Amino acid sequence: MSASASQMDYVLPNELVDGMIAAGGKKATVSVKNLLIRGFYSGAILGLAVILALTVGLTTKMPFIGSLLFPFGFASIVLFGMELVTGNFALLPMATWAGRSTWAATFRNWAWVWIGNWIGTAVVAVIMAISLTSGTMDGAADNVGAPIWDAVAQKIMALNKANVVTKYENLGGMGFFLAFLRGVVANWLVCLGVTMALVSKSVPGKLLACWLPITAFQSMGMEHIVVNQFLHTAGPILGSGVNFGQVIVWNWLPVTMGNIVGGMVFIGMLFYSTHRTKVANVLPTEHDDKLERELAAELGAR
């Protein structure tokens, strides 16, 4: 295969970064209505992905299988160009550093997309809470014989209590710091997955590239704010006994902060610093404006 043919499905790193910068700049100008609609979709689909992962994990007694299927939610967000606040934690700062946006526009985007993501997760949480407590799947049972839907509901409540009270609130300041650190790792991996998907121009390439880091994040049990918006909204609705004040202070706040650092520093800043400047004899100096526009559109900046 010739070099030109082999590069048809591959976006060079400097071109990728230019596309990410352009996308961040365009995202900064998206209307509040579209931020909320696209954010709603992303939150809703991740809520459904969590239910899928838990159901499959409990049914098969193999949680890794659930983690392996979980990334379908992120894949659809990438393919449809929706708004996920954790991805924007990397893109908007890159645009600001390049002079394509401002910090005011960045914070505006983050706030509205965060709200849109939460609305999406909350709607799915209410729907699933009703569904999980109002019926059973014939013939499907967990390891103690309870109907699988009841087992999923119990698992959500257990995760809600463990990831707010047991792991964090009970440890005080150290717990807050641990939630922050796990948020850093989670969004480092998630943004890596989204960025890897953009390196390929083919749908199969995008799916494979984004699947691996996101499966890793899910398997490691790290903290992603949009996933947590679903779990820690559904948990109290189902009756976990955890209140939303505890959720905000001991999970959503430190995890959001950690996700910002993971995306902005470990993906945005590092990629911007090393690939924004084209290196002679390593990366081509010719800039592909068409590719930049394509990448910007692909990242949801339409």
Located regions from the model:
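Alpha-helical transmembrane segments and their helix-helix packing motifs
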Residues: 2-302
